[in-house]
């Protein structure tokens, strides 16, 4: 795919329609940087298996020489290879070549200027910032070598200063802004400059990117020179201050902004640029310095300009990242290789050479262990022992290791956990619920972040199953469909004392549709609390689990879905296993629903605990009574905060051998009953195993029961 057709030829803040994962790479430039004599361009296998993919190869003639242009893609975690320097490091490691000296010596005395023209007012979300004022420049035509480098990378010449900034970004991966100071309001040779990065306070702020007006808001980080908004931080510079052939005085900026802030601005504005792609993935401090020094050297050399003042703000990097590497673990994970028809493991010297080629410093080593220091530009993706082992395999070549399936004796019997999950799934399907399956990766922040996400938008492990079920119902509603009574059984992740714990959860979502009828003659209604709770209780009953429903608060991420005052915490064997609740109003508004939705999420690991499962039921078998039952209803006025479960437990003390069951059938709350009071309806079912009970016998029993309720429980009977 020739993605460079999307480039706007004149600027380095090129607006693109791609994710920025592809680069056009000049083979001649790559060989020059890496001191590489030959590369087999027809054999893409080694590059593809080394973490990069060559999408296409094109041969062109530039400056009278044949050059091969490679379309290369890399993974999201390899921000260090979004530059020719980074790629040349990789190719040098793969081919065993040595890199040329990359360090750029700063121009003599550029930091010893006596003038203090540039002042730092407030650099928000920016820890590393270079700036320099260069005067008396003459913008001439770009030299041929510079034009050729840009042309081979898909850029077209515009003017010398823009070409230099594009060249530096391609070579070092560090965006450079060059601002025409003659276009800054109220700016002359003697004025001082105040630089800042901040969020705009005005409501009508605008900026021109690529000559298009962009509306700003308080969530967009911008940079300013004096009172002029010169760029959207990390994304692109203001077209009003672009350089041209009449430019005489410039401000050269290079900065590293906070990745999350640039990513947020890019999403809000729906703009992806060469600069934002690199800022989002993370920039390297060493490259930042070298890029700025080389930019100043090129500008002063090619424009004959004079550096008037400089400013630098640098965050001191943390201590070196050291990783202990076990040779035995390398052999255990990677396995043996085939060498000259024989099977053997990697030699210690081979591992050493690979680490040296990757610029990993070896600070301690013996035949069993190596302690390595990871270079700064690889600290984003290499910070564990397994990462170092992966690098060894990648450079040596995955295809050189023997591929064999281990001989494992599988136990054909299903585990207790698998049986329990299958049973739960079967019960829920029998109850009429639809099973859904979602990814374990989510967009939400605040969860457990992946170290190596393939897609930045899905870089967190889920801590709950509810978000997936809610999003599925939201999608159905947007497609003019109904909500689905559904469930999901899957793994969730959470931190427990700095350890990542994985559990198997069950989540259910119920309601939302006007399809519940008591009989065909009654109008349809939406699911209410008691009906939803009844479905959940039915599920637990079929699992043979006695669940306690309480009002204990829950403080995890699910609290954002809870409707205040309409939730219950579920307890099994004195352990909180989950929550049942009505969805809150905010979620209703998001879904566009007028009817109620209820959800359940429980930890199946606790429910499945085989130690708590009865192997033999403790029931006593007795024949059903052949005599009819008689029902009596009773209305009581009780405190509003009294739980029905507690009341039924109190009534159990009034034992009557003919009382078969006591159930709640009604609840009524009104000011006429009394403040902090509610009326409930209880249904008492009487049945004898010995005879048919008469009405007079039942009336007497019921009268005695009412007297005990009034006297002993101090409750009022509603007439």
Curated annotation (Swiss-Prot):
InterPro entries named among the record's database cross-references: aa-tRNA-synth_II/BPL/LPL, B3/B4_tRNA-bd, DNA-bd_dom_put_sf, Fdx_antiC-bd, Fdx_antiC-bd_sf, Phe-tRNA-ligase_IIc_bsu, Phe-tRNA-ligase_IIc_bsu_bact, Phe-tRNA_synthase-like_B3/B4
GO molecular function terms attached to this record: ATP binding; magnesium ion binding; phenylalanine-tRNA ligase activity; RNA binding
Cofactor binding notes: Binds 2 magnesium ions per tetramer.
Locations listed in the record: Plastid, Chloroplast
PROSITE patterns: B5, FDX_ACB
Cofactor(s) demanded: Mg(2+)
Protein name: Phenylalanine--tRNA ligase beta subunit, chloroplastic
Gene source species: Pyropia yezoensis (Susabi-nori)
Taxonomic lineage from the root: Eukaryota, Rhodophyta, Bangiophyceae, Bangiales, Bangiaceae
Underlying gene: pheT
